[in-house]
Amino acid sequence: MSICIKDQIQNMNIVIGCTVGCAYCYARNNVKRWHMIDDFADPEFFPGKLKMMEKKRPQNFLLNGMSDLSGWKSEWRDEVFEKIRENPQHQFLFLTKRPDLLDFDTDLENAWFGVTVTRKAELWRIDALRENVRAKHYHVTFEPLFDNPGSVDLSGINWIVVGTMTGVQSRKVHTEPEWAWSLTDQAHMLDIPVFMKEDLVPIIGNENIIQEMPEEFNKVLEVQRSWQK
């Protein structure tokens, strides 16, 4: 039985708003529907949410499900990084589609920096991530997968996620199972864990789904379960 990645990683939207402007952006639609901020193209920082990091029970957090790291002001990033350093019990994930706009170093042991790649023409983002973000951990999210990315240089990558389009627009996109399997095989050749999102079940079958997490995330989940006993 497949699991939902949202049950393993909690969203903490410290910044809401994005300047990238993807046509299929679910976050923009949600912000407009719930009137979270006035202008989605003008990101806003919510420092009060940083208190969530102080909880002692370990958690895996995605910090920018409704923003792109490239749109964060440097002072926002510095404040968040300092809070991450103070709370090593958690693991924190960041995502960007514009790694070419980033340029920083960090030695944070519990921060993971990733890019979204939806097609072969966007593979440059992986190279830009490694070049512009000098960090301990990298991940790549291949979602929604619009075409066959082909051969991918995954050197230095610590985790990949693979998924397809969801919602009403899913009828316009067809992710071939061969694309997901090719990415999986390439990752496994480098001992990189692969998490296929549950929306791939109709495409590859529930019995074939692969849902692997990095060891650091698994340790967090194990401690969570022990707290529930």
Model segments located where?
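Conserved Radical SAM active-site core
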Residues: 1-112, 120-134, 149-154
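Short capping loops/turns at secondary-structure boundaries
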Residues: 118, 122, 173-176
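Structural alpha-beta junctions
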Residues: 86-92, 134-137, 184-194
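Nucleic-acid endo/exonuclease domains
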Residues: 72, 142, 176-177
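Active-site-proximal loop/turn and secondary-structure-junction residues that shape catalytic pockets
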Residues: 67, 98-100, 117-119, 144-146, ...
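Auxiliary Fe-S-binding modules of radical SAM enzymes
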Residues: 1-9, 146, 151-229
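Hydrophobic faces of well-ordered beta-strands that scaffold small-molecule active sites
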Residues: 61-63, 92-94, 111-115, 138-142, ...
